[in-house]
């Protein structure tokens, strides 16, 4: 298997993201130590299993993760944090075999170990029984340029088990290798890497080829790909199947020279700048704290009005817990006097990006009609619900015309 070679720009990006980790660890350790005299230490345990070992001791005693331990052991501040009984950590430890396909530079930069550490641990306890219900978990990598939020790691569940960032399979482990007095350890079969850019995500996803072509043709890619143009972003990414549902005639028109302004107006409705909504957490930015939906008691549904790239035009998005897992839906036309909504489900949530998050959708999002004469009829809604939502060129021109601007 070929080894993964991070390029220089990714290494520099790693430095910018995680350079604050030693300071963070030192601050947290001092805080934990200062409160330890007055605060009782709860012991996390599964039934019939208790431990007095710290996370660092659990890792050090486990031969399956010795290569990971070798990397972390060279970072005394992080070792000190993992050894603090008052700390609360969760570590996603790659097993030794995971490093066989991971590229170690012959002369790694000083921050290379921090890159490994930051991507594989986060604050707070996440026990094995809680992990399957989570859409994302926290790492110690900085998620924004202001160091307000910590980058998320996405969690996928299927019949085979759990996967992190659609790359690393969570492996079975016994209690003695996973439970510590100050947190939990999970074994994974792949080394996690820093999130890729939006451009890379679109370039490497064949099912998004039409979206990528549309962004580049309309020059929206210039701002969406440029991390200096925004703090963060949430992209509701229509797949090729979504464009196909518009119909060949409408799609051909949108990608023609004459239809390009309408395509630009359409795609701007799919991008949320400077707000980051994951399936189970929300970064409002502007100095506001992270909103963790799983920590809000007695509430299984949350709605968000997210500003799109169109002035004064928002997307209403709902995150709803179904069978203990959070699911995203983009709400469409309001019906029944505000009591219910049509919705478009997110088909693949939480594709973590360097500068935000991307959610795949299999239907195109159409902005609301500005004209009172262009209200959606019950027959149109019925056709849409049955999957027959092909649009005519006349319909698109009428709907999108008022939203046209120049690149």
Curated annotation (Swiss-Prot):
Disulfide bonds: none annotated. Pfam families: Fasciclin (PF02469). Pathway: Pigment biosynthesis. Induction: Expression is regulated by the aurofusarin biosynthesis cluster-specific transcription factor aurR1/GIP2. SMART domains: FAS1 (SM00554). It comes from the Eukaryota. Residues 1-35 form the signal peptide. The keyword Glycoprotein applies. The keyword Secreted applies. It is found in: Secreted; Secreted, Extracellular space. GO terms for cellular component: extracellular region. SUPFAM superfamilies: FAS1 domain. Part of the gene cluster that mediates the biosynthesis of aurofusarin, a red mycelium pigment which is acting as a mycotoxin. The first step is performed by the polyketide synthase which condenses one acetyl-CoA and 6 malonyl-CoA units to form the first intermediate, the cyclic heptaketide and yellow pigment YWA1. The C2 hydroxyl group in the pyrone ring of YWA1 is probably formed during ring closure by an aldol-type cyclization reaction. The dehydratase aurZ then acts as the first tailoring enzyme in the aurofusarin biosynthetic pathway by converting YWA1 to nor-rubrofusarin. Might be part of an extracellular enzyme complex composed of GIP1, aurF, aurO and aurS. This is Aurofusarin biosynthesis cluster protein S. The gene is aurS.
């Amino acid at each position: 298997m070929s080894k993964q070679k991070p390029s220089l720009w990714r290494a520099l990006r790693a430095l910018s993201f995680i350079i604050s980790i030693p300071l963070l660890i030192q601050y947290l350790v001092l805080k934990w130590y200062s409160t330890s005299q007055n605060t009782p230490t709860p012991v996390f345990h599964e039934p019939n299993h208790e431990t007095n070992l710290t996370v660092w001791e659990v890792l050090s005693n486990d031969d399956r993760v010795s290569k990971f331990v070798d990397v972390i052991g060279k970072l005394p501040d992080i070792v000190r944090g993992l050894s603090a009984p008052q700390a609360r950590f969760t570590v996603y430890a790659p097993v030794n075999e995971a490093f066989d396909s991971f590229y170690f530079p012959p002369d790694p930069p000083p921050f290379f170990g921090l890159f490994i550490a930051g991507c594989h641990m986060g604050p707070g306890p996440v026990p094995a029984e809680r992990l399957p219900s989570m859409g994302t978990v926290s790492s110690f990598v900085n998620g924004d340029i202001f160091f307000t939020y910590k980058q998320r790691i996405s969690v996928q569940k299927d019949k085979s088990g759990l996967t992190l960032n659609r790359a690393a399979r969570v492996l079975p482990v016994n209690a003695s290798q996973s439970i510590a007095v100050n947190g939990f350890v999970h074994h994974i079969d792949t080394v996690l890497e820093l999130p890729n850019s939006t451009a890379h995500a679109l370039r490497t996803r064949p099912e998004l080829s039409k979206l990528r072509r549309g962004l580049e043709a309309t020059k929206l890619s210039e701002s969406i790909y440029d991390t200096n143009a925004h703090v963060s972003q949430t992209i509701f990414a229509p797949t090729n199947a979504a464009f196909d549902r518009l119909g060949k005639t409408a799609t051909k028109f949108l990608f023609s020279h004459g239809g390009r302004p309408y395509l630009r107006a359409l795609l701007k409705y799919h991008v949320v700048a400077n707000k980051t909504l994951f399936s189970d957490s929300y970064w409002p930015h502007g100095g506001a704290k992270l909103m963790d939906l799983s920590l809000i008691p007695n509430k299984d549904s949350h709605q968000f009005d997210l500003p799109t790239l169109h002035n004064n035009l928002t997307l209403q998005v709902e995150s709803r817990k179904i069978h203990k897992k959070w699911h995203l839906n983009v709400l469409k036309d309001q019906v029944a006097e505000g009591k219910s909504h049509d919705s478009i489900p997110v088909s693949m949530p939480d594709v973590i990006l360097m500068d935000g998050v991307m959610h795949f959708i299999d239907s195109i999002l159409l902005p609301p009609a500005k004209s009172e004469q262009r209200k959606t009829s019950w027959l149109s809604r019925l056709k849409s619900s049955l999957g027959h939502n092909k649009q005519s060129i006349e319909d698109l021109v009428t709907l999108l015309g008022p939203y046209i601007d120049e690149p």
